[in-house]
Amino acid sequence: MKLEWLFLTIAPCDAAEPWQLGFQDAATPMMQGIIDLHHDIFFFLILILVFVSRILVRALWHFHYKKNPIPQRIVHGTTIEILRTIFPSIIPMFIAIPSFALLYSMDGVLVDPAMTIKAIGHQWYRTYEYSDYNSSDEQSLTFDSYTIPEDDLELGQSGLLEVDNRVVVPAKTHLRIIVTPADVPHSWAVPSLGVKCDAVPGRLNQISISVQREGVYYGQCSEICGTNHAFPIVVEAVPSKDYGSRVSNQLIPQTGEA
């Protein structure tokens, strides 16, 4: 029991936990960049908080009305005016430069991805199409992914987060995800992967990811698309050497039965 608890405490956090205040563990370079940017900005915020708090406390302590019944009137100070103009201008620059760099890297499109998956949102399930396995227009590797009802959950599965068919992808491989809806606006968002792509009716949006470690990653629709709008997304990253057999054993029989 102790070993099991130790494993749970050191295992990567790839799904939301009760009372969780921080980020989920990063599984892609994009998510790691988001976390690093957050920490860098938070560092500047702490410095500003300490500096402003010190000035405020010092002013309240030294310029109390009991110590200075007649306050000194200062109507102009060139030095302080220059400093309070320059420093607030420099700080946003330090924040903006890495922010724009991360933003452009997240919006980058792969010219030749190793694999393409199409995610089609419905009310309230998803259809996934592995475009690279399409042999013809009539026959394609396509399957539906539904939320597992709480009464059908097995031991170890998360309520409101588990699906019957997961999206299986190879780890450490450049992937392209094409997102589109079949009815109303949806969204394809997985926090551990650092992706959130809106599905707009009549449009095809795409994102590029590269999952750096094996694991199961949970997400949910982040658009209010109806009663069950938070229907989940489950991405399972497997080793590249096992990916072919995993797809042929799990996904292809399911599509054949459908």
Curated annotation (Swiss-Prot):
Gene3D superfamilies recorded: 1.10.287.90, Cupredoxins - blue copper proteins
Compartment(s) of residence: Mitochondrion inner membrane
Function statement: Component of the cytochrome c oxidase, the last enzyme in the mitochondrial electron transport chain which drives oxidative phosphorylation. The respiratory chain contains 3 multisubunit complexes succinate dehydrogenase (complex II, CII), ubiquinol-cytochrome c oxidoreductase (cytochrome b-c1 complex, complex III, CIII) and cytochrome c oxidase (complex IV, CIV), that cooperate to transfer electrons derived from NADH and succinate to molecular oxygen, creating an electrochemical gradient over the inner membrane that drives transmembrane transport and the ATP synthase.
Residues annotated as binding Cu cation A1: 186, 221, 225
CDD domains: CcO_II_C
Signal peptide: none
Keyword annotations from UniProtKB, A to Z: Copper, Electron transport, Magnesium, Membrane, Metal-binding, Mitochondrion, Mitochondrion inner membrane, Respiratory chain, Translocase, Transmembrane, Transmembrane helix, Transport
Mitochondrial intermembrane side stretches: 1-39, 107-258
Primary subcellular site in the record, as a coarse category: mitochondrion
Superkingdom of source: Eukaryota
GO biological process, one term: ATP synthesis coupled electron transport
Membrane protein topology class: Multi-pass membrane protein
GO annotations of cellular component type: mitochondrial inner membrane
InterPro entries: CcO_II, CcO_II-like_C, CcO_II_C, Cupredoxin, Cyt_c_oxidase_su2_TM_dom, Cyt_c_oxidase_su2_TM_sf
Transmembrane helix as UniProt keyword: yes
SUPFAM superfamilies for this protein: Cupredoxins (SSF49503), Cytochrome c oxidase subunit II-like, transmembrane region (SSF81464)
Parts of the chain on the Mitochondrial matrix side: 62-85
SUBUNIT field: Component of the cytochrome c oxidase (complex IV, CIV), a multisubunit enzyme composed of a catalytic core of 3 subunits and several supernumerary subunits. The complex exists as a monomer or a dimer and forms supercomplexes (SCs) in the inner mitochondrial membrane with ubiquinol-cytochrome c oxidoreductase (cytochrome b-c1 complex, complex III, CIII).
Molecular function terms, GO-annotated: copper ion binding; cytochrome-c oxidase activity
EC id: 7.1.1.9
Family designation: Belongs to the cytochrome c oxidase subunit 2 family.
Top class in the EC scheme: translocase
Protein name listed in UniProt: Cytochrome c oxidase subunit 2
Reactions this protein catalyses: 4 Fe(II)-[cytochrome c] + O2 + 8 H(+)(in) = 4 Fe(III)-[cytochrome c] + 2 H2O + 4 H(+)(out)
